């Protein structure tokens, strides 16, 4: 995009202050503690509607204040506009956010890549392939809805899983991997059970919203 701004790089306005509930604060503190000490991967586990994204955005905001960048992966291209708006409203004023997916034009991708190498991007929001982007001073890789099968590529080659690439990258860049979902994959659940991965749990929904009522109906008729 010679002579004009790259429309796939947004600037945050920081309009909304992130106020966490007590439950969210506990999860946020667990992530901060791991980042400050062991840098073990953390699983942010909470029901749909618990506000996991706000916990992650608050942590990303802290990293930006320290001069560190984040890569945030979502499973579907359709989710990027919604998250892009959230990032622009919640991240610190002036933070630069790059959007990366298969819909990003090649010219825009070149501009994003050059900006990443120059260290002028604070956060990347993208789908699976964004896991390979060269974020300067990487602080965190976050994979939202970690259990989703779209994070695994089998064809075309090379085959890879974004979760495994994230774990490898953070181990070589003094960063932290954070996974989030209401329904962890069996692989991550096993790592939590073995204490390879730490668990940051949010017990209920944000704003004291109630959980759905579950009923199991009888689908048979008694035999007489």
Question: Can you describe what each PLM-predicted range is?
Answer:
Residues 129-178:
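SF2 helicase catalytic motif II
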Residues 67-68, 119, 174:
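Glycine-centered short loops/turns at secondary-structure junctions
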Residues 25, 168-224:
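Conserved interdomain linker/interface between the two RecA-like ATPase lobes of SF2 helicase motors
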Residues 1-50, 54-74:
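Pre-Walker A segment
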Residues 98-106, 148-160, 222-224:
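Flexible beta-alpha connector loops of hexameric P-loop NTPases
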Residues 80-96:
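Conserved helicase motor "Helicase C" RecA-like lobe of SF1/SF2 P-loop NTPases
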Residues 86-90, 100-124, 135-138:
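Conserved motor-coupling elements within RecA-like helicase/translocase cores
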Residues 76-77, 120, 126-129, 145, ...:
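A short beta-strand-to-loop transition that corresponds to the Sensor-1 phosphate-sensing loop
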